[in-house]
Amino acid sequence: ALLARGARRPRSAIRGLLMAFQPIEIGWAGKGEVLTLMKAEWQGGQPLLCGEALFCGYYLNELLMHLLPREDAHEQLFAHYTKMLARLAADPSGKVREADLRSFEKALLKELGYGLTLNHDSAGTPILTEAFYTYRMEQGPVRLEHEEAATQVVIGKTLLDLEAEDFTDPRTRYESKALMRTLMAYYLAGKE
């Protein structure tokens, strides 16, 4: 955590720099948990998020804050995050957001070592597009005999589409969102 002393003062040099989702290069000093911000320099290039895109950005930040260890660098994930912010800012229609959010959630879980198994079930059998599955934590997809046999049911096509990041099918979008919500809740485990 950084403390920005005097940042709210009208003549503060850093007042306009400390905005959400803007890249800044910072310098700090101090010891312990709370450090003091010494310098901040705007890196530019990131359009401001507004509307639904802003809420999506906050969602990404919440996931990162709660799931990543403090002060642990994840360069690939940060690159994915900056691309995601650019896509959110560039898409006022909101059509791409669901697909991008699922993609980011998958990348985050993979970076944390919880990569999803989506192309074969827990027995090692390839996923069948018309079969029904439930996703068991730390185990992967388990094939069901009937759709009603479990609470979190997805069709095989959804798992394969999620693997390929193809969200053109409305059922895939709906089931992927529900599945990823369940997975995120499991890994957050009360950290919300």
Language-model regions, residue ranges each:
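Non-catalytic alpha-helical scaffolds and adjoining flexible linkers that form interface surfaces
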Residues: A1-E192
